[in-house]
Amino acid sequence: MAKKIVGYIKLQVPAGKANPSPPIGPALGQRGLNIMEFCKAFNAQTQGMEPGMPIPVVITAYADKSFTFTMKTPPATFLLKKAAGIKSGSAKAHVDKVGKVTRAQLEEIAKTKQADLTAADLDAAVRTIAGSARSMGLEVEGV
């Protein structure tokens, strides 16, 4: 018989930097899950990634206090900021442009994000990422 699921916990945790402090500790603690076990497993799985890269993770909590977790790809905004070489997006996205991204950079990001996007093909995924870039105040070239 399958384990009974008691809830899901969604967090964004920096790669390789999971520790019991907030937000991880309180979120897992209120469900009675082993915080250090999650931190060690998460840090081991994100060992090869760029340290500090935010990784969305969905933790499935079971009635017997066990858990499983699935990691998703980094947020598109993080990847776009990294590609454009900026710290943050524009406060007035359609007025003030803060950087540029090329079609090649958008395709690279779309390939990374394709598993998490609902786009039918790569071109649709590129258009989705381009829309995110425009809403951040980035100038999109070649789309």
From Swiss-Prot:
GO terms for molecular function: large ribosomal subunit rRNA binding; structural constituent of ribosome. The keyword Ribonucleoprotein applies. Pfam families: Ribosomal_L11, Ribosomal_L11_N. Keywords: Methylation, Ribonucleoprotein, Ribosomal protein, RNA-binding, rRNA-binding. Signal peptide: none annotated. GO terms for biological process: translation. It comes from the Bacteria. One of its GO terms (cellular component) is cytosolic large ribosomal subunit. SUPFAM superfamilies: Ribosomal L11/L12e N-terminal domain, Ribosomal protein L11, C-terminal domain. NCBIfam families: L11_bact (TIGR01632). PANTHER family: 60S RIBOSOMAL PROTEIN L12 (PTHR11661), LARGE RIBOSOMAL SUBUNIT PROTEIN UL11M (PTHR11661:SF1). HAMAP family: Ribosomal_uL11 (MF_00736). Part of the ribosomal stalk of the 50S ribosomal subunit. Interacts with L10 and the large rRNA to form the base of the stalk. L10 forms an elongated spine to which L12 dimers bind in a sequential fashion forming a multimeric L10(L12)X complex. Belongs to the universal ribosomal protein uL11 family. This is Large ribosomal subunit protein uL11. The gene is rplK.
